[in-house]
Amino acid sequence: MGSQATTYHMAMYPWFGVGHLTGFFRLANKLAGKGHRISFLIPKNTQSKLESFNLHPHLISFVPIVVPSIPGLPPGAETTSDVPFPSTHLLMEAMDKTQNDIEIILKDLKVDVVFYDFTHWLPSLARKIGIKSVFYSTISPLMHGYALSPERRVVGKQLTEADMMKAPASFPDPSIKLHAHEARGFTARTVMKFGGDITFFDRIFTAVSESDGLAYSTCREIEGQFCDYIETQFQKPVLLAGPALPVPSKSTMEQKWSDWLGKFKEGSVIYCAFGSECTLRKDKFQELLWGLELTGMPFFAALKPPFEAESIEAAIPEELKEKIQGRGIVHGEWVQQQLFLQHPSVGCFVSHCGWASLSEALVNDCQIVLLPQVGDQIINARIMSVSLKVGVEVEKGEEDGVFSRESVCKAVKAVMDEKSEIGREVRGNHDKLRGFLLNADLDSKYMDSFNQKLQDLLG
């Protein structure tokens, strides 16, 4: 069993969030590349959305799961893209109700190990049927170390905002901390029920602490100290699959966007995008656009229509439309983000700090402005701005979390000014990190190590 040629049969059952499904499937492809067989458990009508990403169809097979009906859950809903954000707890409740089906499937498949995330009941189920369980996270280990560390947990004591504003006592980088408004949101999650009668905080803590091992898509060069901290705190082996970098796009940019970007000089355009699931309030949406306008630079903003507005057009004040005519585009549909970030005219990326978006930014030349909205995005922003110093975060009010057009403009100008101390620092750090991430041997090195640690775990 300890030979290098040993291969295993693995099951994967990720949370029904789009980013979680694609993140797990990326790992499935990497493991299949090492010869392992993967059974990927997925809602039956969602399977078609991942089939085109299957690089090893002879080793990766889909196992359809029927999502149970739950009162309040839209009929046919299978992923987070099918339900409004306030209803995602119902989707979690539905996933929890698949427990008996999952037990039957895993017994029938005769797998050696199951990878999971939000299903906190899977480790005990796995032990019951004699297989190992590995918690695989699509978010940063720093997030788990900061928010979930066992040294934070005192029996009978509720975590407060003040607790969450500072790092745990033995955290490796005490300079990383939360602002008051951010700590308030994190503290709320410690009491917020998420699927049945369990809080989101307790669900994830149980999922992590009951596992046989923890796995992350990162590398020691970026988050090594936080991985060591988690390994010590949870007393679990930590497996690193290497950073989740974007696969080079084989498509070409739409001609209309290529023509528009081509009108501007190299490195002069701001590209702003907040992902497929982030919707801003109308006042924030407008303030962000006013901030981009205030820079005096051309910009392309790919944003969803805000709350309280039926369309992008209806959300933009007439005065702003006049000011940005010819040098600013606000687009409400999907665009080829990788191709925008690669375009020579784009010099700055204003991001909501989703990890996939930041990974795309890190392997390109554009400078990074960080404007996180919720949850792990906040921690991602601290990694980029405080730990790695490769970007600048937009300043917000300590208590209310509100940003201004002036703070947006200030952050953009800071990274775009090559002569300023901040501009030189983030550019230099970004250049070094990009060179490291683009090393052709990086992925194989980490997957060799991941494979060996997995063999050690499975015996």
UniProtKB/Swiss-Prot annotation:
GO molecular function terms noted in the UniProt entry: anthocyanidin 3-O-glucoside 2''-O-glucosyltransferase activity; hexosyltransferase activity; UDP-glucosyltransferase activity
Gene Ontology terms: biological process: anthocyanin-containing compound biosynthetic process; pigmentation
Disulphides: none
User: Per its UniProt entry, what is the enzyme's top EC class, as one word?
Assistant: transferase
Q: Name one Pfam family in it.
A: UDPGT
Which positions in this protein are listed as binding an anthocyanidin? 20, 375
Q: What EC number(s) has UniProt assigned to this enzyme?
A: 2.4.1.297
Q: In which tissues is it expressed?
A: Mainly expressed in the petals and tubes of flower buds at around 24 hours before flower opening.
Q: Which CDD domains match?
A: GT1_Gtf-like (cd03784)
Q: Catalytic residues?
A: 20 (proton acceptor), 117 (charge relay)
Q: Which UniProt keywords apply?
A: Glycosyltransferase, Transferase
* Source domain of life: Eukaryota
Q: What pathway does this protein act in? A: Pigment biosynthesis; anthocyanin biosynthesis
- Reactions listed under catalytic activity: an anthocyanidin 3-O-beta-D-glucoside + UDP-alpha-D-glucose = an anthocyanidin 3-O-sophoroside + UDP + 2 H(+)
Binding residues for UDP-alpha-D-glucose, per the UniProt record? 138, 335, 337, 352, 355, 357, 360, 376-377
What the protein does? Glycosyltransferase that mediates the glucosylation of anthocyanidin 3-O-glucosides to yield anthocyanidin 3-O-sophorosides. 3-O-sophoroside derivatives are required for the bright blue or red color of flowers.
- Hey, which family's this protein in? Belongs to the UDP-glycosyltransferase family.
Output the PANTHER family linked to this UniProt entry.
GLYCOSYLTRANSFERASE (PTHR48049), UDP-GLYCOSYLTRANSFERASE 79B30-LIKE (PTHR48049:SF34)
Question: What's this protein's name?
Answer: Anthocyanidin 3-O-glucoside 2''-O-glucosyltransferase
Task: Name the gene.
Answer: 3GGT
